[in-house]
Amino acid sequence: MGALFGDKRIIKNLSPLIVGGGHESGLRSGTQNVSGIVGFGAAAQLVKNCLSKYQFRMLGIKNHFFDEVRRQIPGVWDNGSYDRVNNTINLWFKGADANAVMTAMPNVCVSSGSACQSAVPAPSHVLIAMGIDRTAASESIRFSFGNTTTDEEVDQAILELVRAVGYVRAINGVALHLGSEIEVNNRAQSA
């Protein structure tokens, strides 16, 4: 069961997946699924009734996550704008390769790109299109929260993230301090 909403000029050019019968202007064949239609309507009403509460909760989780990460990890920037979905945040961890950080925290499910590009190892094309340079994009991680995400899971993710970013930066000789600029211990220069 689903719904199709769009510009009539585009919809009129669509072809049905299954032909036969003339339901829904020829786009759907067969007898209408009455119980599916009723269920879809009930689901839509449930979303309408709960959406504000869900969005408020997701915003609270995301803000708590970002506030704690920023408090505990130096050199963190939010790549997004204020006006965005409430359940997702993309953060740049200066001096910490995103893939290395993700590998160092196997119990936390995150991505270095958009959901549709999760298997692509290159920096996020979305971040590049936003004007973020390739280095910053390759050090950026996308965090998403859902309806079943608990406060305990968020706090555990923060702990693992703090450890993982610190570990990756230490391996790379990057030392950051809260409230200060980046200091890089370049082994090649000291040799």
Label each PLM-derived region with a short phrase:
Residues 1-25, 29-42:
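Active-site PLP attachment segment
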Residues 7-11, 94-96, 148:
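Short loop segments at secondary-structure junctions
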Residues 11, 34-37, 44, 62, ...:
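A general structural signal for well-ordered alpha-helical segments in protein cores
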Residues 14, 27, 111-114, 144:
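Thr-Gly-centered strand-to-loop micro-motif
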Residues 44-67, 77-85:
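Structural signature of PLP-dependent enzymes
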Residues 74-79, 110-114:
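A short linear hydrophobic-aromatic micro-motif
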Residues 88-142:
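Conserved C-terminal alpha-helix-loop-beta "cap" of PLP-dependent enzymes
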Residues 124-191:
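PLP-dependent enzyme catalytic core of the Aspartate aminotransferase-like
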